[in-house]
Every structure is written in C-alpha cells, then in structure tokens.
A protein has these predicted regions:
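Catalytic Walker B motif of ABC-type/P-loop ATPase nucleotide-binding domains
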Residues: 160-164
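Helix-to-loop junction immediately C-terminal to a conserved catalytic motif
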Residues: 52
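Conserved ABC transporter NBD signature motif
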Residues: 60-72
Length: 254
C-alpha cells in the first residue's frame, strides 16, 4: 500500500533556532483524521509547511504518496489560517472556491467546465452552494471556514491539511466544523492542528503531540508522559474536559 505520508528524521531550523527536531511519522491509511496538538510556537504550522514543500528540512526526508512534496501538490488540499485576509475585498464565494483550481489550470488560464464542476461539488459537500453568489465578507465566521475548506476540496485532494480551523469560531460553529470533518475523513486522509483538546478527543481517529518533537503512537490514546512533555506542565492543568479513555501511560494502563 502506498504511504500517504513518510517523514524520516526531519529537522527544521530558522537561523540558529531548531523548530522541528527528529520528526518521524508514517501514515498508511488513505482516510481518517489525525489531530496534532501542542502549544503556541511548538512548530505545528511549520510542520504543515514542510508537508506542503514550502519549507525544506536541513536534515531528513519527506515524502507524500511516495514523492517529494513539491511533486505531490495536486494531491493535497490546504486550509491555512486566514489572519490577513481582507474580507472587504469584493470577491464572491464562487470565485474564492474556483481559485482552488489554480494548481490544475495555472495562474493566467481560463477555468474549464471540469473546474467549475469541481467547485460546485466542493460547495455542495460543505453545504454552501446556495451562498455561491454572496460576497465572502457577508458570511459568518463558520460559513467562511466552510468556503475555505471547499476551496481546498476543489483540488480533489487525497490529503487535506488544516491549520487551526476552529480558531475564532463559537462553540456551535466549531461543532458544525467538526461534524463536516467527520464526514470528509471517510473520503481522504486529514491532518488538523489545533489547541482544542476536548474536540480532538471526540472527533479524531489518532492523536499526535508536537512541541519541537513529535510524540505519536498510531493511536487515539495519549500517554500522559507525552502530554506533559509537550506542554511542559502537569497533565491536570491541560487535560480538563478530555475523556479519561484518551489518556494513558506508556504501559497502556489508565
């Protein structure tokens, strides 16, 4: 079976500062949701950029679907944090989602019928097709996030990467977002980085902890030692609201 992701001893530096240290990760399943948790500044966004081929490690190897990331981009959808997005810019939902097809059409080429069909299917998947003519700035935060996910889905990805997709959403919108991802994970592999410990304990299939080093055991359970090492504080301060079954020690005992 072709591996979705294979990282071997990956190290990343900014200047003299090590951001990622000795990362090893292997995902074989073509579907499912992996949640990656960790503190601010722990390297989660950097990790996604490495998978996208936007950052090259100074040591180690990265492969997506058996190829280097730069040769696998058409197979990957990405939903970044849109901190600097100007929501007053006059662009419609439909136009936003169509831009997701640029990896197939090129920057200056016209959209084809297959591109429009892919955009339509993506909007229907996230239940936003009826809003296609709305300006993006007229939508709620949860609706915008669905549109950005549709933009990523328009590429027909085998792997979907999401960077803090629940950021800025109220609890109801977050719940809708997670239910959407719960449906999508049966069609593709998904990696989501987040601070929301309670959400990952409910919706993800597997969990990894990242704070420069990656702790991953191919399981939904998080060894208490890994959680404390990642957040550098006692588990009682960070695991409030997490189901007890999610936490384990390295011997597998509750």
């Amino acid at each position: 079976m072709e591996k979705v992701i294979e990282l071997k001893d990956v190290w990343v530096r900014y200047g003299n500062q090590t951001i990622l240290e000795g990362i090893n990760l292997e995902l074989k399943e073509p579907n499912g949701l992996l949640g990656i948790i960790g503190p601010n500044g722990g390297g989660k966004t950097t990790f996604l950029k490495v998978l996208l081929g936007l950052l090259k490690p100074y040591r180690g190897s990265v492969k997506l679907f058996g190829k280097p990331p730069e040769k696998s981009r058409e197979l990957v959808g990405y939903v970044p944090r849109y901190k600097g997005f100007d929501f007053d810019f006059p662009i419609s939902v439909w136009e936003v989602v169509l831009t997701g097809r640029m990896s197939h059409t090129g920057l200056l080429k016209n959209y084809r019928e297959e591109d429009r069909k892919a955009a339509e299917d993506a909007l229907k998947t996230v239940e936003m097709f009826e809003y296609r003519d709305r300006q993006i700035g007229q939508l709620s935060g949860g609706q915008r996030q669905r549109v950005f996910i549709a933009r990523a889905l328009a590429t027909n990805p085998k792997l979907l990467l999401l960077d803090e997709p629940n950021s800025g959403l109220d609890p109801h919108m977050q719940d809708e977002l997670y239910r959407l991802l719960d449906r999508l994970k049966h069609k593709m592999a998904i990696i989501m980085v987040t601070h929301d410990l309670s959400a990952v304990s409910v919706y993800v299939d597997k969990i990894a902890c990242l704070n420069r080093k990656l702790h991953y055991h191919n399981s939904k359970e998080i060894p208490i030692e890994d959680l404390e090492a990642t957040y550098q504080c006692p588990v009682e301060l960070i695991a409030h609201g997490m189901p007890h079954r999610v936490l384990s020690n390295h011997e597998g005992n509750p």
